[in-house]
Amino acid sequence: MPKRTDIRKIMVIGSGPIVIGQAAEFDYSGTQACLSLKEEGYQVVLVNSNPATIMTDKDIADKVYIEPITLEFVTRILRKERPDALLPTLGGQTGLNMAMALSKNGILEELNVELLGTKLSAIDKAEDRDLFKQLMEELNQPIPESEIVNSVEEAIQFAEQIGYPLIVRPAFTLGGTGGGMCDNQEQLVDITTKGLKLSPVTQCLIERSIAGFKEIEYEVMRDAADNALVVCNMENFDPVGIHTGDSIVFAPAQTLSDVENQLLRDASLDIIRALKIEGGCNVQLALDPNSFKYYVIEVNPRVSRSSALASKATGYPIAKLAAKIAVGLTLDEVINPITKTTYAMFEPALDYVVAKMPRFPFDKFESGDRKLGTQMKATGEVMAIGRNIEESLLKACRSLEIGVDHIKIADLDNVSDDVLLEKIRKAEDDRLFYLAEALRRHYSIEKLASLTSIDSFFLDKLRVIVELEDLLSKNRLDINILKKVKNKGFSDKAIASLWQINEDQVRNMRKEAGILPVYKMVDTCASEFDSATPYFYSTYAVENESLISDKASILVLGSGPIRIGQGVEFDYATVHSVKAIRESGFEAIIMNSNPETVSTDFSISDKLYFEPLTFEDVMNVIDLEKPEGVILQFGGQTAINLAKDLNKAGVKILGTQLEDLDRAENRKQFEATLQALNIPQPPGFTATTEEEAVNAAQKIGYPVLVRPSYVLGGRAMKIVENEEDLRHYMTTAVKASPDHPVLIDAYLIGKECEVDAISDGQNILIPGIMEHIERAGVHSGDSMAVYPPQTLSETIIETIVDYTKRLAIGLNCIGMMNIQFVIKDQKVYVIEVNPRASRTLPFLSKVTHIPMAQVATKVILGDKLCNFTYGYDLYPASDMVHIKAPAFSFTKLAKVDSLLGPEMKSTGEVMGSDINLQKALYKAFEAAYLHMPDYGNIVFTVDDTDKEEALELAKVYQSIGYRIYATQGTAIYFDANGLETVLVGKLGENDRNHIPDLIKNGKIQAVINTVGQNNIDNHDALIIRRSAIEQGVPLFTSLDTAHAMFKVLESRAFTLKVLD
């Protein structure tokens, strides 16, 4: 069937900011889809609010709108652009929900816009729990006994009929948001209340729990001619009951018999055909491990997280082909771009095993609830490919970057058996390590299988690894054993630990014995046909399929899994760096471990190595490829952390050199550099012991800012007000040592701003200065950043440019650098310098139209800034105002405090741009889903130190129609200063309504809550913040952000004046 000629212009909706449940996979799929449609000659209009994405680059679509994905703004763009069709299936749940809203509000019908890929009826049938249930019954597909409810009372009634345990699944939500498992009525009421609130259609499915069944996924494709195929099946290591995004997943499925595979495959194909989906679809099924009984859990009628995994696992580009199918092409007409010899109708075949492991944020959120369930908690994931399960699992494990290189974590051998078994039973994020420890203690597989419902097959594979550890320990320096364990994925570091020697000794011994990895190609067809794809993974086998060209090459290290502090921004920089390398005439090689990202799309680079980013794995690729050099600047802290070992091994690091990286990161060297350059910084010291820290703080004076050196995202950073808190921090938050000192700085309360700059060693280019709305103390990644700056004087700007030049030349920076400043009493201080790309690079690249990563890469490769057209020093500012605002995932992370501070908590970002600050702020808040009505009730509960400022803020909110509610201390202060307030209680004050109840009953439209450092753990304040998050009420923990919101509301308000 030829492609359609009756449509010319197609709008694609992106997925917005990265949040838990919806990450970089939609940048990958959206980019693929836009390019695929352009390839077919269609005009593509893209709407997305996330500036950190490749898909929002100008060359990906014909017209790019970085605007809020809300009904108001998408409708405006539709009216302006008048596209013929809309493709909503590549923007995750955000895209689907927006398509539904446009349809229900009559916009699509009014503007005569057709939905492509998946019809509204199919979205409804898959997402609306009632219609889905009816469809499954019509198809004779089994689903767990369930009831659709629109109220808590209906949920209780159903529970009384069938009993517990139950699972609550809200309709039209993402990553299991609002859902969960219930063992009793109290839990049912709590979860259903949240679920109904979070479901855009106020609907939940309450179903009998089938926790303990195997969870299997099928990624399927269908075209308009009813051709359908299975791209990939996947099996979760964890049973039903743990969200698939939080589970270890293997592809292809490992424990299914032919009969079971055929049964579930037929069911998946029946479902996609019945839904008449044209494109990709994900079907999740539960299989009874003891019979052929199965249930359909759910269907995602769109490209999903699993689609990205299936694409990278097989090499089959699902999103690219889904876009072509959406415009009428059929699977037997489209050539598979990976083989270039077969058609897309051929089902991929795998001759390897893929393991996906989730990356959790609990290293940042130690107070978070680590128990896994039906609501997703992982921020990102890694993928590894091997020839056997053990190899792929161990490679995935060391890709996580959580400080482990094997399925063993420190101190577990000291854990009691009772604690061990409890941790295994509870199913937390680190259960895999506890299972391995239990096997080391000779617990039987049967016992562990009964505790966890994990298939014995997988537990047996863990036992193989544990037995090999034992074999290694008993046969020190045995070459044959070394060869055996390398085949099973053991790292040099893990072997060194068991042999009690260092990693270099293992590496040298292995190389002398000729035990070297080979690289195999991912080709979608298990080598059955010729393939042209340069997509490789390592294994210890015989034939090497990665052929080395004569062309000079450059290796770029990616940034690994998405986590808080290191998000998709670094992948954006990596992709642009590769583009510049290719333009400069070199062969570009990428090494990365993240299946969600654009950088691991095989078409981006000349060669892709899907490998862990560890010293061993990187050196193996370098030994084979012998590149001219390695670029580390765009891989975040992941790549920078490898600099020392790579340099020691004689690898040529391109750009800023190791000794200069150290001068920026090492406290004493950095202080000496600043002194030599005559640049002020807040007074500070380095401490390697608790007593040194206390002495340093006494010299500086409290409050002080404390943090470990060499961190990203402000991990373990804290503002400390007194000696007691400092001692507590030194003994619990960090392990200080001469190798890992703690930095102690004066905490300056002032205006914060930052610059990204490019240096060629002689001149610098500063694309722009970003001014933070929140004052110093809130992590830069959690602050709203404004470009160009709105309140900085010319003198301050000149000083910032001068200091940036001095630092760039003084630190011998070649390529990117990021500098953060604080301005107090009109004096500029340097807080920190990062001689690498930062998370603001994509935002600044978009708003200045300078492709910063490309320019920096060419400079790194020897070009000079004089050869570009951007000039030197500070680039002329934009006429528009642009705001980068953070996006948070607190709804997914129970027990995590939403109070902002020096440790980063946001998972993503959005951008708002307009002709003035107020309009840009409005767009930024809307894009971040922080919406406030023009009037209502606002609660103030603030720290004593903030009361004076909060009073002025409350007065202006009152002036535009808000009624001020306040807790006792705040109310007394407000009343004494002439501001009338409604007194409210905190918790347990039964004589009046307390805040959580008011929030729950919809009486409060916003909460402003600030806490002094001594009261951070205040239980009442924590519950108030949590209530606001759970009920979707705007929460401000910084008065600066609340003031920015006031500016928006004020700009929307009319002046009402009595006639004089």
Curated annotation (Swiss-Prot):
HAMAP family: CPSase_L_chain_A, CPSase_L_chain_B. Mg(2+) 3 binds at Q820, E832. ATP 1 binds at R129, R169, G175, G176, R208, I210, E215, G241, I242, H243, Q284, E298. Pathway: Amino-acid biosynthesis; L-arginine biosynthesis; carbamoyl phosphate from bicarbonate: step 1/1; Pyrimidine metabolism; UMP biosynthesis via de novo pathway; (S)-dihydroorotate from bicarbonate: step 1/3. GO terms for molecular function: ATP binding; carbamoyl-phosphate synthase (ammonia) activity; carbamoyl-phosphate synthase (glutamine-hydrolyzing) activity; metal ion binding. Mn(2+) 1 binds at Q284, E298. Residues 930-1060 form the MGS-like domain. Its cofactor is Mg(2+); Mn(2+). This is Carbamoyl phosphate synthase large chain. PANTHER family: CARBAMOYL-PHOSPHATE SYNTHASE [AMMONIA], MITOCHONDRIAL, CARBAMOYLTRANSFERASE FAMILY MEMBER. Large subunit of the glutamine-dependent carbamoyl phosphate synthetase (CPSase). CPSase catalyzes the formation of carbamoyl phosphate from the ammonia moiety of glutamine, carbonate, and phosphate donated by ATP, constituting the first step of 2 biosynthetic pathways, one leading to arginine and/or urea and the other to pyrimidine nucleotides. The keyword Ribosomal protein does not apply. Composed of two chains; the small (or glutamine) chain promotes the hydrolysis of glutamine to ammonia, which is used by the large (or ammonia) chain to synthesize carbamoyl phosphate. Tetramer of heterodimers (alpha,beta)4. The gene is carB. Binds 4 Mg(2+) or Mn(2+) ions per subunit. ATP 2 binds at R707, A746, L748, E752, G777, V778, H779, S780, Q820, E832. SUPFAM superfamilies: Carbamoyl phosphate synthetase, large subunit connection domain, Glutathione synthetase ATP-binding domain-like, Methylglyoxal synthase-like, PreATP-grasp domain. The large subunit is composed of 2 ATP-grasp domains that are involved in binding the 2 ATP molecules needed for carbamoyl phosphate synthesis. The N-terminal ATP-grasp domain (referred to as the carboxyphosphate synthetic component) catalyzes the ATP-dependent phosphorylation of hydrogencarbonate to carboxyphosphate and the subsequent nucleophilic attack by ammonia to form a carbamate intermediate. Pfam families: CPSase_L_D2, CPSase_L_D3, MGS. Keywords: Amino-acid biosynthesis, Arginine biosynthesis, ATP-binding, Ligase, Magnesium, Manganese, Metal-binding, Nucleotide-binding, Pyrimidine biosynthesis, Repeat. Its EC number is 6.3.4.16, 6.3.5.5. It catalyses: hydrogencarbonate + L-glutamine + 2 ATP + H2O = carbamoyl phosphate + L-glutamate + 2 ADP + phosphate + 2 H(+). Mn(2+) 3 binds at Q820, E832. InterPro entries: ATP-grasp (IPR011761), ATP_grasp_subdomain_1 (IPR013815), CarbamoylP_synth_lsu (IPR006275), CarbamoylP_synth_lsu_oligo (IPR005480), CarbamoylP_synth_lsu_oligo_sf (IPR036897), CbamoylP_synth_lsu-like_ATP-bd (IPR005479), CbamoylP_synth_lsu_CPSase_dom (IPR005483), MGS-like_dom (IPR011607). Mg(2+) 4 binds at E832, N834. Residues 1-401 are annotated as: Carboxyphosphate synthetic domain.
